[in-house]
Curated annotation (Swiss-Prot):
A molecular-function term among this protein's GO annotations: structural constituent of ribosome
Gene, per the UniProt record: rps7-A
Summary of the function given for this chain in its UniProt record: One of the primary rRNA binding proteins, it binds directly to 16S rRNA where it nucleates assembly of the head domain of the 30S subunit.
GO CC annotation: chloroplast; plastid; small ribosomal subunit; thylakoid
UniProt entry keywords in alphabetical sequence: Chloroplast, Plastid, Ribonucleoprotein, Ribosomal protein, RNA-binding, rRNA-binding
Organism listed in the record: Arabidopsis thaliana
Main location per the UniProt record: plastid
InterPro entries tied to this protein: Ribosomal_uS7, Ribosomal_uS7_bac/org-type, Ribosomal_uS7_CS, Ribosomal_uS7_dom, Ribosomal_uS7_dom_sf
Protein name per Swiss-Prot or TrEMBL: Small ribosomal subunit protein uS7cz/uS7cy
Signal peptide: none
Pfam families: Ribosomal_S7
Location in the cell: Plastid, Chloroplast
PROSITE patterns to which the protein is assigned, alphabetical: RIBOSOMAL_S7
Amino acid sequence: MSRRGTAEEKTAKSDPIYRNRLVNMLVNRILKHGKKSLAYQIIYRALKKIQQKTETNPLSVLRQAIRGVTPDIAVKARRVGGSTHQVPIEIGSTQGKALAIRWLLGASRKRPGRNMAFKLSSELVDAAKGSGDAIRKKEETHRMAEANRAFAHFR
């Protein structure tokens, strides 16, 4: 048995302008090469563009987009008797949000366009409306889990 204690779960800090944890999670995921100020600039520009496009609160659009992309269930590869099965597992809220943010950023990076702020704002607006690559990724994950439902007892 391990003598080591369990690690405390870290709570995400909130960003300086919007005082929102989701914005901070987004900033930390978009971060490259330690350039946090650039990451903040990209996120704030994207939120400003969302404000201009939708004429609503950009934070509510962000929340709606993340809620729409967050998966309830995912598949995990599990080796049983020499063969690998895709076993569906339920996902907690924190892990689901992290996956949603990763998918949103991945989809916005793949988009054609001028700059990252523009691409991210477009992807967030699309996800809030229920379309876009990130939503497609969620539906694909749910489809995979449904197809492999027979292996759920391998959990």
